[in-house]
Structures are given as C-alpha cells and as structure tokens.
Amino acid sequence: MGAEAFYDEYIAPALTDFISRRFEGVCRDYFSLQVRSGKMKGVRNIGSYYYDDPIYRKNGEFDVALEFADGYEIYEAKYYAQPMTLDEIHREVQQVEEIKELTVKQIGFIAINGFAERKEPYLYLDGNDIFANE
C-alpha cells in the first residue's frame, strides 16, 4: 500500500472525525466566553446532550446544549467544507423535535463555512461569528 492510499484509508477519516469533534468543543467554548463576558445570561450549564429512547429505538447526541431554568437551547455544530444546506437543517430540527422529554426553547446551527440558506426561527452562527475577536 502506497503512502497516498494509506493516508486515504486510515488517516483522512480519523483526521476528519478529530477536527469535527474539536470544532464542537470550540463551539461550547464560544458560549462559555459569551456567558463569562456577560453577553449571555441565565445559562446554567453548557455541554452536549445525549439521548436514548429504548421504546422507539433511537439515540443520538446534540453537539451543544445550553441549559436554562426553563429549558434548553440546542445547537448542531458542523465542520463542513461547504455551507450547510436547508435539507440538513430540516433533518436536524426533526431529530430535536422527536425528543419528547426535552424542553427546547431555541434551535441553532453552527457551520464553519456558513449556510446555503437560512430559515426562521433558528439561530445561525458561522466561523466568522465563532472566531471573531470581540
């Protein structure tokens, strides 16, 4: 196996997964900084939200979950080479809406390369928002 084939087979997939996971952490750090600077108020906890529904045999993870007294803000973080599409947004929204025990106040999306389209009432952040030095 040549070097290029080895990279394509073993390194590239692991690298993509690593960068995506690290980007999720950067997004959580962004919200931590927003809270510490006073730009966001009322956040009790910042993390990921994992769910397991044995009745419907569904499980999954939401990348960024902000806990408030009256519910959660859920954000899906995507480290894509291209803008996030409206179809992807709709699939993610459907996944959030299927979780009945979770009180969701707001759904948002974070895409490093922005969005092909934006639809109300969701919140949108891109790489410029996350990495702005404000």
Enumerate the predicted regions with their spans.
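A cross-kingdom feature that marks ATP-driven nucleic-acid transaction machinery
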Residues: 1-134
